Amino acid sequence: NALETLWSPVLNQINVLKGLFPGKPVYLTGHSKGGPMATIFAARMHFTPAVTTEPEAVYTFASPHPGDKDFVDNFPLANIPVIRYENRLDIVPLVPPTEAAITLAGNKPVIGKLFKIAEGWNYASLGERRYIDKQHQVIYNKPELTPKEFRKLAWTVIAGPCGLRKVAMAHMYTCGNGYMLGTCPSGVCP
């Protein structure tokens, strides 16, 4: 269990940093698989009485859905805001698919069968969505993908190597790619 493996070392490091920087807030972040880990970690911190530090917020980048509707409904959003960044060509934030995505894609040739497998999983998005558009601008509280946007993304994925390369570049967090272009336009990159 990844959370169990990380629990003690991360809490220990948080405590060390809190000792070095008293009064400073704690933020949890994660990219890709690290997004749900940060989110689940924050929930566990909140619901563990022995843990006296609560994150100020969770920021995720390219995060898959962290849990099902029950997890989302019971997450302490009032205490720990979750801000999730999603890049327009990144498919990772769409998995596991939500019920809306399954309904949207379930009757489509090729991908429909794949989506039907996930029926009943009941995964859901969590937190405030910040969408990075084609011009690398961050759009706040953009609704989930429309059917037209979903079709366009699906065609990009199945277009072959060029489309897959675009999708892979959109998922990256390195300088000059995907998430860095939208979240850090003035640059920390050389």
Segments from the language model and where they lie:
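Serine hydrolase/lipase
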Residues: 2-29, 43-190
